[in-house]
Amino acid sequence: MEIAGKAVCVFLLLAIIKLRRSEGINRVSANLGHNTVMTCPTRTNISMVTWKINPKTGHQCTLAYRIDKDSTGKTNCSDRINWRSRPDWDQALEIQQVGKADEGNYTCEVVNADGNFHRLYHLTVIVAPRMALYCDDYGNPVCEAETEKSAAEISWVPESNSTPRADSHDNGTVTVVSWFAARSTNGKNPTCIVSHATLNETKSINCSSSYRDLILCIAIILSFLIIITFMAVIYYLKLHGCRFCHRSKPPDIIPTYSSQDDTVEVEPYTTYVQKENVIYNSVSDLTLRQNLPQGQSPAT
């Protein structure tokens, strides 16, 4: 019985291995911000393909395709993670603009009549170190270094009195910025030295000449604009302003009177005088008659 039990266990184990064939873990790396592609086992007469993604942080993501129904499914996957092409003839997975959150395990499962076949990946995202040395708007040398944690160390030759500033980002990188603030360079160009486990680089720069050139360029542009503006003002005054200067004074208006107006004004007065005389004469005649004795008539 014991031997029979062991035989059954071995048979079941072999059956499971046949149905679930998997390869060893494939370790892949991708640069931060770049695209990466992972492929599935090559098999014929595939009936179903499934990608199972287990990142270090976040939820599990699943991509599936069924051949018989020609349908795809997607669960908890970002738009950056998708099939590289049509899954009916290319089951590869593509991740666009890889980030630190994409690190983790990726498994492709292919199903056909012979069983289930798996290919496992472990993705590591590499942050390529970056160094930049430039001049700021005031003509001061600035040195930057972007690396994975921990932060890079920046030093200057000649020695600088400034304190570097470190900024941490969500993608797991750290950017260190340092300004050169030495009082004197003794005629030598400032040199930035970056030290890190993934980056050791040295660069020099001369900002004095570039800063003077910038100031000269700005001065020339401003002078040109001032001249153009001054000429435009003069032209405007010449074209419009002198019209107001040379305008002549309008002539004085002398009122005119017509003889007809005088006649109209005199006629009412003459009529009034005539009426007064008539009334006066009538009153005088009446008074004279009352004062005469009876039987006498006033002399005419």
From Swiss-Prot:
Membrane side Cytoplasmic: residue ranges: 235-300
Any GO BP annotation: regulation of neuroinflammatory response
Residue positions the entry lists as glycosylated: 45, 76, 105, 171, 200, 206
Keywords from the named record: Disulfide bond, Glycoprotein, Immunoglobulin domain, Membrane, Phosphoprotein, Receptor, Repeat, Secreted, Signal, Transmembrane, Transmembrane helix
Signal peptide: 1-24
Gene3D superfamilies, per database record: Immunoglobulins
Domain Ig-like C2-type residues, every copy: 122-206
Ranges of the Extracellular topological domain: 25-213
Posttranslational mods: Glycosylated. Phosphorylated.
Membrane spanning stretches: 214-234
S-S bridge residues: 40-108, 143-192
Tissue note: Highly expressed in macrophages, peripheral blood lymphocytes (PBL) and peripheral blood mononuclear cells (PBMC). Weakly expressed in bursa, thymus, spleen, liver and brain.
Family matches, as InterPro entries: CD200R, Ig-like_dom, Ig-like_dom_sf, Ig-like_fold, Ig_sub, Ig_sub2, Ig_V-set
Gene Ontology CC terms, in alphabetical order: external side of plasma membrane; extracellular region
UniProt keyword annotation of Transmembrane helix present: yes
UniProt keyword annotation of Repeat present: yes
PROSITE patterns: IG_LIKE (PS50835)
Domain Ig-like V-type: 25-124
Molecular function GO terms recorded: signaling receptor activity
Identification of the protein by name: Cell surface glycoprotein CD200 receptor 1-A
Lineage of source species: Eukaryota, Metazoa, Chordata, Craniata, Vertebrata
